[in-house]
């Protein structure tokens, strides 16, 4: 699915900036890899101590797994793009690791969508009890999400089956069969559609949540300002990460995919679209470094255990507990877990 390790054969290629593709981008991915492994390793360690007692927690744990696995694909891309690895490594990137990259990226996106729905249901519709918020249902839904993403992506592994000679530069699309190219195009459109649907639902749900919380706190002046700021911060952090990390890539993805699978694009146009895709894909990859920050803002149990492990006292915890007991409102209880 990623064709970043490759360029056109010499007789068909335009002038290329190898400084960008073979040095700058690999170095940036190396930085993201180191930060991503460390941050998600710590996040996984902390979540190991967080009980899976709520659907919200289960979805977050799935995101941690997806981000960690996605981070493990970065070294293959780094070695392939920089030319430090053997040519067979580029084939492996085209056939396997790039597909795993996309699977885990979209798994993460879908689970953030499920979290927004779960928070909407609990905060805006607290009296509507439903089995969809049960732990068992959330675990089943998590399995279904992983299976569906794999079903969409695995054919890209199977259908990238064309033989390849020993070359220094490989174009991933040329390793696909005719059916593989069609599936590549269709699956990319489906994944892009999934993102935009989740992104729009995210905006709708969190707009409704914000209105609900602000209306709730209009009834009480105590701690109203601080709670509003906290709620706004939590919501803004999620939407900000989605907008910065994923929107640019999904704007660039469609024209880039068309340039791969349609013949009327000029060589120069293909190169420009490839650079756009590479840099926006890097932004998407950087999401693995930002998600742990979201966990800290979003999940109170995560925050409490992390601070406990680091021996950092939580500020105003007593005031928060008193406020919850005094008001006894479901919306208020959910403020720290948006």
Swiss-Prot record:
TM annotation in the entry: 30-50, 56-76, 97-117, 140-160, 189-209, 235-255, 279-299
Record's subcellular location: Cell membrane
Membrane-protein topology: Multi-pass membrane protein
Disulfide bonds: 94-172
Tissue: Highest expression in the placenta, adipose tissue, stomach and intestine, intermediate levels in the brain, spleen, lung and heart, lowest levels in the kidney.
One MF annotation (Gene Ontology) recorded for this entry: G protein-coupled UDP receptor activity
Family: Belongs to the G-protein coupled receptor 1 family.
Function: Receptor for UDP-glucose and other UDP-sugar coupled to G-proteins. Not activated by ATP, ADP, UTP or ATP.
Protein name: P2Y purinoceptor 14
Species classification: Eukaryota, Metazoa, Chordata, Craniata, Vertebrata
